[in-house]
Amino acid sequence: MAQVFNFSSGPAMLPTEVLKLAQQELRDWHDLGTSVMEISHRGKEFIQVAEEAEQDFRDLLSIPSNYKVLFCHGGGRGQFAGVPLNLLGDRTTADYVDAGYWAASAIKEAKKYCAPQIIDAKITVDGKRAVKPMREWQLSDNAAYLHYCPNETIDGIAIDETPDFGPGVVVTADFSSTILSAPLDVSRYGVIYAGAQKNIGPAGLTLVIVREDLLGKAHENCPSILDYTVLNDNDSMFNTPPTFAWYLSGLVFKWLKAQGGVAAMHKINQQKAQLLYGVIDNSDFYRNDVAQANRSRMNVPFQLADNALDKVFLEESFAAGLHALKGHRVVGGMRASIYNAMPIEGVKALTDFMIDFERRHG
């Protein structure tokens, strides 16, 4: 079978080594004669899987001991509700930074529970889309927390700054598309959440990192499966968790540690992004409209000079084993998602194709 590189924004490519191991273990896990999908989540065998996965995740991000890690249902959208339901307390407002599609989606959900103070961080720099630096974010005095999205998958916009607003500001962030791709100072945040389907594992699992002093504040009507305290008190097993996604994510954590950890992966991700943006920037045929300071290393949207060629580009790239390059319906064009599991060889195959496509159609 010819090599295929999957540039999907999520569910995304998984490491080949992980898929091969999962395939080997699928029908007979650890000589039990059953699949890991079939064993009880409360049995000692799966408890070991769960504990190892959490410890490996903690090791990868150097998560401080005063933070809890929760393995949840609901995806990022579930946490759009989970954050206000757990953190508002007796306050009625929170600060929300709007820098793109997913930040705006979080704001829309938050409006069901509070009156969000919206910080419009979208700006233009030299004709390209950008984000205001954090020092220009105007925070309100009465906000229960601050929420932002460090990486916008659709817009291809990243906020790489580390928040430093002082101990009185509870910072929450949607790291769904950038978790484990670069070093992260967890201690600067109150809550970090991430859907698994981009840099962690398959869809169906959501990880939440929550500072323990923020537990016990959930709204009385908060659904139990979104209540951080309930989930923590039950070791993320208040109801049956997505066990197969949890298991596969654990394999990804071990794979990532074997690659040298997050710092090593960050260097590779920088190389991949530089390679792809380099081809775009050195061409009049392709363009990216995000200012360099805010370009995403995970999701690279680009347009062709003649959008009439979009269909041809997608057909030819797919035939060449370069899949899922169609841009989001909101913005059109192309998008290459190059998460941790995408090898640099995949990006090189894409850039070689792009150069050849321009030669033939430019």
Swiss-Prot record:
Pathway: Amino-acid biosynthesis; L-serine biosynthesis; L-serine from 3-phospho-D-glycerate: step 2/3; Cofactor biosynthesis; pyridoxine 5'-phosphate biosynthesis; pyridoxine 5'-phosphate from D-erythrose 4-phosphate: step 3/5. GO terms for cellular component: cytoplasm. One of its GO terms (biological process) is pyridoxine biosynthetic process. GO terms for molecular function: O-phospho-L-serine:2-oxoglutarate aminotransferase activity; pyridoxal phosphate binding. It is found in: Cytoplasm. L-glutamate binds at S9, R42. It comes from the Bacteria. The modification N6-(pyridoxal phosphate)lysine is found at K198. InterPro entries: Aminotrans_V_dom (IPR000192), Aminotrans_V_PyrdxlP_BS (IPR020578), Pser_aminoTfrase (IPR022278), PyrdxlP-dep_Trfase (IPR015424), PyrdxlP-dep_Trfase_major (IPR015421), PyrdxlP-dep_Trfase_small (IPR015422). Binds 1 pyridoxal phosphate per subunit. The keyword Endoplasmic reticulum does not apply. Keywords: Amino-acid biosynthesis, Aminotransferase, Cytoplasm, Pyridoxal phosphate, Pyridoxine biosynthesis, Serine biosynthesis, Transferase. Homodimer. Belongs to the class-V pyridoxal-phosphate-dependent aminotransferase family. SerC subfamily. This is Phosphoserine aminotransferase. The gene is serC.
